[in-house]
């Protein structure tokens, strides 16, 4: 929704709706500072994309540019789905070749994220297994 100070009904934080545990994996431990810093949120988003791009590199290499159950698969769609539904959910989706209905905590399907966020340029995101927010 683009609101940096937003906390949703499940406790996800900021413009990109980060979970607290996810923030910790990229080096953010102060939620108040995070909510009050658009710059930190933007850096956190890039760090998480880098981490997820590393984690999902095999899936991206194998499936990018293909059509799976009617969905044109793109790197940006995969990265968005990983951010919004989790890396594990993305791995499960591709393990079952898109035939399982996988959804996030709000009931939004992973397929819809792949469609909605497909086709964006994410070539500038560098895969990095140890990506952290640099303050």
For each feature predicted by the language model, list its residue ranges.
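Hydrophobic alpha-helical segments, principally membrane-spanning helices and signal/leader peptides
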Residues: 4-5, 71
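Acidic, Ser/Thr/Pro/Gly-enriched interdomain connector segments
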Residues: 5-6, 34
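Short, surface-exposed glycine/acidic/tryptophan-bearing loops
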Residues: 6-26, 80-82
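Alpha-helical segment that forms one wall of the substrate-binding/catalytic cleft
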Residues: 20, 25-76, 84-92
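Charge-dense, intrinsically disordered terminal/linker segments
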Residues: 28-31, 98-99, 104, 134-135
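Catalytic and substrate-binding regions of cell-wall glycan-acting enzymes that process beta-1,4-linked
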Residues: 68-125
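Low-complexity, Gly/Ser/Thr/Pro-rich intrinsically disordered linker/tail segments
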Residues: 126-135
